[in-house]
């Protein structure tokens, strides 16, 4: 009697294992996957908008960045190297702009938003933060040794989490000096 109760779930498990293995093998990280061209990009959820001179630049889900040169009547999609959700965009000059979003992504454009390059992501941000605080601790710039060691350990822990933290806003005073939060 117990054998009959065990066999169906066991068969179901055996039959689904190849599907799970196939899904895992085909997974691509959104930080390594460029945003897909989509006719619906301008109609998808857009989280942030900015002006790049007369151009309107909007950012949204799946790495979509759309541009309008006619006040929003028509939109074109920009080339974006990631498919992480983007939440904010800012242009301190008509040509130079910054966009931020999930997975710790920071993008930069030097051509009014037509193309974007990755400046930082959650993987490299953790490594950068850990190396900075380790160097500061080595110089004695972080205060007492036990506090400095705890801070260095915390930055290493944050870095080990990977790219799960988001940047939610961006602002630049000029094309080189700004803040991301």
PLM segments and residue spans:
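N-terminal secretory signal peptides that target proteins for export/translocation
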Residues: 1-4
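Short, functionally important structural connectors and interaction interfaces within domains
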Residues: 7-9, 38
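Bacterial N-terminal signal peptides
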Residues: 9-18
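Residue-level hotspots at or immediately adjacent to binding/recognition sites across diverse folds
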Residues: 21-181
């Amino acid at each position: 009697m117990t054998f009959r109760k065990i066999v169906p779930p066991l068969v179901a498990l055996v039959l689904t294992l190849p599907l799970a293995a196939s899904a895992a093998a085909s997974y691509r990280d959104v930080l390594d996957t460029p945003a897909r061209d989509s006719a619906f990009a301008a109609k998808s959820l857009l989280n942030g908008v900015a002006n790049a001179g007369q151009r309107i630049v909007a950012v949204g889900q799946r790495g979509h960045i759309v541009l309008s040169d006619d006040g929003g009547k028509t939109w074109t999609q920009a080339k974006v190297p990631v498919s992480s959700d983007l939440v904010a965009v800012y242009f301190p000059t008509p040509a130079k702009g910054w966009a931020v979003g999930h997975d710790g992504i920071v993008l930069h454009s030097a051509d009014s938003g037509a193309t974007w390059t990755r400046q930082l992501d959650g993987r490299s941000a953790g490594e950068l933060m850990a190396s900075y605080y380790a160097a500061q601790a080595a110089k004695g710039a972080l205060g007492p040794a036990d506090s400095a060691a705890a801070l260095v350990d915390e930055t290493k822990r944050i870095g080990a989490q990977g790219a799960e933290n988001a940047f939610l806003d961006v602002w630049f005073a000029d094309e080189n000096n700004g803040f991301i939060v």
